[in-house]
């Protein structure tokens, strides 16, 4: 019995506790616990949308916490244009340096506004889907491709599994 209790405690000490949320309203309550980013690309929590899909999972592991946030917002045309304008003009400061998101049309399935691209195994970006007035906001931290909740099409072409050191391209 002591062995079972000890193995349970060791497992949770090493692999941490997983927190998962799938409810649309959970995005509005997101406080960024276990997230090592200001989540600059994500919209304000009070923004109205036509529809919303949200997934949040974090696991506080002993060596490297993992986190994935996926938010898909469909907007009216006017809301979509205002939100893409916000992304185009977004500036944020870090250590006396001001940066803007960069626009990437080559490495994503559509035009993306990127804040972080494989910076210490972290990715933060927003993909714009013009034909449906939809924006997909993504934050990934120390994630393996097989554990990611969203479609693999929404990953950048240069995505690397956590510490795997291999690109996920399928080209020979």
Segments the model singles out, each with a brief description of its role:
Residues 7-81:
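N-terminal export/targeting and maturation segments
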Residues 83-172:
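Extracytoplasmic electrostatic interaction patches
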């Amino acid at each position: 019995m002591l062995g079972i209790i000890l193995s349970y405690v060791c497992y949770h000490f090493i692999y941490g506790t997983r927190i998962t949320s799938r409810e649309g309203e959970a995005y509005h309550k997101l406080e960024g616990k276990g997230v090592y980013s200001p989540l600059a690309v994500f919209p304000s929590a009070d923004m109205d949308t036509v529809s919303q899909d949200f997934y949040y999972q974090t696991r506080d592991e002993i060596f490297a916490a993992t986190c994935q946030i996926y938010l898909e917002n469909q907007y009216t045309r006017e809301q979509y244009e205002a939100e893409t304008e916000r992304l185009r003009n977004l500036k944020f400061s870090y250590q006396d340096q001001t940066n803007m998101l960069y626009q990437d049309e080559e490495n994503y399935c559509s035009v993306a506004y990127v804040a972080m691209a494989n910076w210490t195994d972290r990715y933060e970006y927003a993909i714009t889907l013009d034909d449906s007035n939809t924006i997909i906001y993504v934050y990934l931290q120390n994630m393996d491709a097989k554990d990611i909740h969203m479609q693999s099409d929404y990953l950048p072409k240069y995505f690397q599994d956590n510490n795997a050191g291999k690109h996920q391209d399928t080209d020979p």
